[in-house]
């Protein structure tokens, strides 16, 4: 009977520890990695968001801005954005799939605006070396899943 109680206690302890351990693992995967910093902004990549889409990659990027950025909505500004970008590593270019902007830094506060683009309407931008876009592309392409 004593060994049965011990097994019950172990089973309960494992059941209670399981969700906490899983939450810690998930939190670690959702951390933002700082990839590029200038006087005006800092850009981060969520490493767990990097996925292959055909021969390209897609990743979520957070950008914090030093000064309020003008929004497409009249009279509104934002200090941070979360953008899903498509990366073409071979041609050193990237395109915005979705963007959401926020009043505060670190994606905090009221959402200001959002926009999306379909795969057939992507607007590709060059990502030259030593630029924020270039640093983002280099990081994402170096983290290629399965590669």
Q: Residue ranges of each PLM-predicted region?
A:
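N-terminal secretory-pathway/extracellular module detecting exported/lumenal segments
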Residues: 22-82, 88-147
């Amino acid at each position: 009977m004593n060994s049965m109680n011990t097994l019950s206690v172990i089973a309960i302890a494992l059941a209670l520890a399981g969700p906490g351990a899983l939450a810690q693992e998930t939190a670690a995967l959702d951390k933002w990695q700082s990839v590029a910093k200038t006087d005006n902004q800092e850009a981060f990549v969520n490493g767990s968001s990097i996925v292959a889409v055909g021969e390209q990659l897609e990743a979520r990027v957070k950008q914090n801005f030093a000064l309020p950025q003008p929004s497409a909505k009249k009279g509104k500004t934002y200090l941070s954005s979360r953008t899903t970008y498509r990366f073409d590593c071979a041609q050193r270019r990237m395109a915005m799939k979705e963007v959401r902007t926020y009043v505060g830094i670190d994606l905090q506060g009221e959402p200001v605006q959002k926009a999306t683009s379909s795969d057939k309407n992507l607007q590709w931008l060059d990502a030259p070396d030593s630029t924020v876009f270039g640093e983002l592309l280099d990081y994402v392409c170096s983290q290629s899943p399965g590669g």
